[in-house]
Structures are given as structure tokens and as C-alpha cells.
Amino acid sequence: MGKKHVIVKPNARQASVSITPAGQLLVTVRAPASDGQANQELIALLAAYFGVPKSRIQLVKGHTSRHKVIELLD
């Protein structure tokens, strides 16, 4: 399906997925940005958003950054 640029905001009150005017995904997660907790919640939210299993979403770049690149595998 391709690569997507994602901006993640951890420690949010409510988890959500939206699209910025620039076409990037803006994902707010409730989990803190420590020990990969926010990344795990990010993958779960994106899997639900795109309607695919979590195993088909791969974090390509930005493991410790708020700006990430994910890939949706076929």
C-alpha cells in the first residue's frame, strides 16, 4: 500500500487519527513516549484506522522521533 508520513503526539487525553492540511497523518496517543509504548499504541490505532492487522504495519523510520514513516505491507 505504500509509505505514510506520521506525526505522533504522546500523552494525549484522547487517542485519535486525523489528516493535516499537508496530507500527513496526525496521531494522538494516550501512551507515554517511553519504552516503545507510544509506538505500540500508534501501530494499533493505525491498524484499526486502515482496517488491516497490526502485522501489516511496519515502522520504517523515526523510532524515537515524533515524525515517523510507516509502511503498509501488502
UniProtKB/Swiss-Prot annotation:
Belongs to the UPF0235 family. Pfam families: DUF167. Signal peptide: none annotated. It comes from the Bacteria. Gene3D superfamilies: YggU-like. InterPro entries: DUF167 (IPR003746), YggU-like_sf (IPR036591). This is UPF0235 protein tsr1994. GO terms for cellular component: cytoplasm.
